[in-house]
From Swiss-Prot:
Residues 630-665 form the UVR domain. GO terms for molecular function: ATP binding; ATP hydrolysis activity; DNA binding; excinuclease ABC activity; helicase activity. Belongs to the UvrB family. Disulfide bonds: none annotated. This is UvrABC system protein B. Residues 26-183 form the Helicase ATP-binding domain. Residues 600-620 are annotated as: Disordered. One of its GO terms (cellular component) is excinuclease repair complex. It is found in: Cytoplasm. The beta-hairpin motif is involved in DNA binding. It comes from Yersinia enterocolitica serotype O:8 / biotype 1B (strain NCTC 13174 / 8081). The keyword DNA repair applies.
Length: 670
């Protein structure tokens, strides 16, 4: 019997949530393909969606526009569904340079990539959950529309082991090698196996916490046990176990041999075309490269850049969509598109950028034309494959509104009673000095400020100016990677600094209840960064604070400003009426400062340094004498460096914060 979703929350739906949940469920049960939930910042959109998932009990994919937001949603869904499978599926590249050719300088750039092993394990865990159970929520980025191994081949390659099964050791080892597991009797890690006599230990590729022990006796599986790979301690026996391939791209030998024949046929045709056009260098290049790949595939079962032959390996025809995560989602699955006004255009844009780069590679003989089918889904293919969909946004785009027939489900009232920020329009002439005085007021009462500018140059100059005048300020720009960006946002919330300056980086979905002021410089300059949607999203960053306020600096009120102010005031009035009717006093959000960085770091479970373990509060050291306090600082610093050497950056960061506080305490009492 399939397990049901069980929602854990100390809250019950309130405000506009019960009505939104009822309408969404009604629409899904009536077979509506598209619905739009217009939920303002802080209205509990994720909680509403979690209730819908739990009530309908259907496997669900949640699409987010970027890794940061996907990580935040993953953390929230894990809290709502601790007993169910909540999975995380984003690009596993920490760094990715696709192969490319620049004809103007005759430069070929080899593919170069760095894979995050922990995220690869989470991707494998996500597809395994979708294949094995129905109580699954997969939080994914737009990586979900990129090619993945064919689910049919993936299922065929699995190794099923059952207690009492007749199979010899050699057969198991051969099958493990076909699944791309490697034997390593010294270092036992994910995706490896080791052999000790009649005992085979397998560390599944999708696991980071446990491994499988297979005990054989006279060509029979005598016992299957789950054990802790770190301590070796047996946890429990299982009657059967399925070993999944180490990678999504694993392919049976017979399919590889068939693919090789098809590649040879295409190569012969391509050579004729190139020779007919007198492209001798390109003909020599494609022949040499393809024959080398064929030789590797014959010997090893794979080659570098094998994804460029994915059309043959998956058995799909020219122009057909590649297999993606959507192929793993059951037909009655549910799709939630979060921050849909950003996510939907992203899906549409991925295919075109990929296509132009590949066409150059094909034209100059670096790849066969079939490589063009190793691509993300086209938008129309996404539309055809997507199951019943709920678009979630505070500012839905034209596409979502059209698809849902203009019928939008409003979730404007917040259960906490929090009102939308007050909006003031102030002149541009004095914007910098006015902003500085506002920052000082907020810093004095331990609140944070977000400032958005129009250009990178202005952001840099403003940051420098604010620093010179004593403000604790940081600048967030496009060169900062995902992990560092998360650290900056975390440090802002912790009070390491008071002001964050950005351009277009602080809009959708990020929870920062400590931010009480959003300042939008040059708000009267019409354009993408100052459109109605951008303004509403930016203003919304202050909507989680009791004293939320937005200052728009402009010498005139543009049409976009007028619409954004009008919509914010409409929402504010609706919330105010709700509060008065029910006697609700607005309450600020007290959201704990979690750390989503662990998504990119391996688990430290079992090492006595679990991620859940909180660093001791500095209040515990208030009574220490200066000498004892100095000793404690040295101890914590030593621990911090040990964590950093072990790549346990989350614990190191927590200790760094604690050492910083203790140093201030030490200075105060010295």
């Amino acid at each position: 019997m399939s397990k049901s979703f069980k929602l854990h929350s100390e809250f019950k739906p309130a405000g506009d949530q019960p009505e939104a949940i009822r309408k969404l469920e009604e629409g899904l049960e009536n077979g509506l393909a598209h619905q739009t939930l217009l939920g303002v910042t802080g209205s509990g959109k994720t909680f509403t969606v979690a209730n819908v998932i739990a009530d309908l009990n259907r496997p669900t994919m949640v699409l987010a526009p970027n890794k940061t937001l996907a990580a935040q949603l993953y953390g929230e869904m894990k809290e709502f569904f601790p007993e169910n499978a909540v999975e995380y599926f984003v690009s596993y590249y920490d760094y990715y340079q696709p192969e490319a050719y620049v004809p103007s300088s005759d430069t070929f750039i080899e593919k170069d990539a760095s894979v995050n092993e922990h995220i690869e394990q989470m991707r494998l865990s996500a597809t395994k959950a979708l294949l094995e159970r129905r109580d699954v929520v997969v939080v994914a980025s737009v990586s979900a529309i990129y090619g993945l191994g064919d689910p049919d081949l993936y299922l065929k390659m699995m190794l099923h082991l059952t207690k009492g099964m007749i199979i010899d050791q050699r057969s198991i080892l051969r099958r493990l090698s076909e699944l791309q597991y490697s034997r390593n009797d010294q270092v036992f890690q994910r995706g490896t196996f080791r052999v000790r006599g009649e005992v085979i230990d397998i560390f599944p590729a999708e696991s980071d916490e446990w491994a499988l022990r297979v005990e054989l006796f006279d060509e029979e599986v005598e016992r299957l046990s789950i054990f802790d790979p770190l301590t070796g301690q047996l946890q429990h026996e299982v009657p059967r176990f399925t070993v999944y391939p180490k990678t999504h791209y694993v392919t049976p030998r017979e399919r590889i041999l068939q693919a090789m024949e098809d590649i040879k046929v295409e190569l012969a045709e391509r050579r004729k075309v190139l020779l007919a056009n007198n492209k001798l260098i390109e003909e020599q290049r494609i022949t040499q490269r393809t024959q080398f790949d064929l030789e590797m595939m014959n010997e090893l079962g794979y080659c570098s850049g094998i994804e460029n032959y994915s059309r043959y390996l998956s058995g799909r025809g020219p122009g057909e969509p590649p297999p993606t995560l959507f192929d793993y989602l059951p037909s009655d699955g549910l799709l939630i598109v979060d921050e849909s006004h950003v996510t939907i255009p992203q899906i549409g844009g991925m295919y075109k950028g990929d296509r132009s780069r590949k066409e150059t590679l094909v034209e100059y003989g670096f790849r066969l034309p079939s490589a063009l089918d190793n691509r993300p889904m086209r938008f129309e293919e996404f539309e055809a494959l997507a199951p019943q969909t709920i678009y979630v946004s505070a500012t839905p785009g034209k596409y979502e509104l059209e698809k849902s027939g203009g019928d939008v489900i409003d979730q404007v009232v917040r259960p906490t009673g929090l009102l939308d920020p007050l909006i003031e329009v102030r002149p541009v002439a004095t914007q910098v000095d006015d902003l500085l005085s506002e920052i000082r007021i907020r810093a004095a009462i331990n609140e944070r400020v977000l400032v958005t500018t129009l250009t990178k140059r202005m952001a840099e100059d403003l940051t420098e100016y604010l620093e010179e005048h004593g403000a604790r300020v940081r600048y967030l720009h496009s060169d900062i990677d995902t992990v560092e960006r998360v650290e900056i946002i975390r440090d802002l919330r912790l009070g390491e600094f008071d002001v964050l300056v950005g351009i277009n980086l602080l809009r959708e979905g990020l929870d920062m209840p400590e931010v009480s002021l959003v300042a939008i410089l040059d708000a009267d300059k019409e354009g993408f960064l100052r459109s109605e949607r951008s303004l509403i999203q930016t203003i919304g960053r202050a909507a989680r604070n009791l004293n939320g306020k937005a200052i728009l600096y402009g010498d005139r009120i543009t049409a976009s400003m007028e619409k954004a102010i009008g919509e914010t005031e409409r929402r504010r009035a609706k919330q105010q009426a709700y509060n008065e009717e029910r006697g609700i006093i607005p309450q600020g959000l007290n959201k704990k400062i979690g750390d989503i960085l662990q998504l990119g770091q391996p688990s430290t479970r079992g090492k006595g340094k679990g991620r859940g373990g909180k660093v001791a509060d500095t209040n515990n050291y208030q009574s220490l004498a200066p000498k004892a306090l100095d000793q404690k600082i040295r101890e914590l610093e030593a621990k911090m460096y040990t964590h950093a050497q072990n790549l346990e950056f989350e614990q190191a960061a927590e200790l760094r914060d604690q050492v910083h506080q203790l140093r201030q305490q030490f200075i105060a009492i010295s």
